[in-house]
C-alpha cells in the first residue's frame, strides 16, 4: 500500500476500512522516514500475513501492535526487520498458534530492548535468525508454558528474561 514511500513522515489511516484485508505484507516496507504511525485500530481479524509489514521503517521508535488479531495469521517473517529505532514491542496478546514463520522478525532492530511475546503452545514455529543483530542487554518477557524453550536458548545470556 505504501511500499517504498520514503518521503512519508506521518500518516493517519483512521477512516480506511481494512475489515476485508487478509494480507498486510509490505504495507509500510521501505518507509524509511516514517516517524509516527498509529496502527492500533487496524482490523486484522482476517489477516494471514504481516510479512515485512514495517521492514526498513528505521525512524519508528514505537509501533503499537498489541491489539492485532492474529488468530488466522501464518506468517510474520521480517515484520519489524531493520526498524533500527524501535525500542520495545508488545505482542503478548497475540494468538500465535497458527503462525509458522517468525524468521528474521527483529533482524537489524539494534535499539530493541524490551520484547513481550506469547507462543500459545505453538510447536511448529521456525526461529531462524529471529534475534540476529540485537543488542546484548535487552529484556524478554514470556508466559509460563508457552513453548519458549527453543527461543530462550537463542537469547543472549546478558538479557533479562522474565516469566509472567
List each model region and its residues.
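Structural signature of tandem-repeat unit edges
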Residues: 6-21, 32-48, 58-74, 84-100, ...
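Small-residue (G/S/T/A) turn/hinge positions that recur once per unit in extracellular repeat modules
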Residues: 1, 22-23, 27, 49, ...
Amino acid at each position: 500500500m505504501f511500499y517504498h514511500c520514503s518521503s512519508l513522515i506521518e500518516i493517519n489511516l483512521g477512516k480506511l476500512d481494512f475489515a476485508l484485508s487478509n494480507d498486510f505484507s509490505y504495507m509500510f516496507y521501505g518507509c524509511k522516514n516514517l516517524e509516527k504511525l498509529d496502527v492500533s485500530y487496524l482490523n486484522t481479524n482476517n489477516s494471514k500475513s504481516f510479512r515485512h509489514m514495517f521492514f526498513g521503517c528505521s525512524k519508528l521508535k514505537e509501533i503499537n501492535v498489541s491489539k492485532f488479531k492474529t488468530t488466522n495469521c501464518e506468517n510474520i517473517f521480517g515484520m519489524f526487520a531493520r526498524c533500527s529505532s524501535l525500542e520495545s514491542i508488545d505482542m503478548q496478546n497475540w494468538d500465535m498458534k497458527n503462525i509458522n514463520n517468525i524468521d528474521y522478525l527483529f533482524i537489524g532492530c539494534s535499539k530493541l530492548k524490551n520484547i513481550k511475546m506469547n507462543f500459545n503452545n505453538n510447536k511448529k514455529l521456525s526461529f531462524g535468525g529471529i534475534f540476529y543483530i540485537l543488542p546484548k542487554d535487552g529484556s524478554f518477557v514470556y508466559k509460563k508454558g508457552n513453548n519458549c524453550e527453543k527461543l530462550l536458548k537463542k537469547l543472549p545470556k546478558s538479557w533479562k528474561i522474565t516469566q509472567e
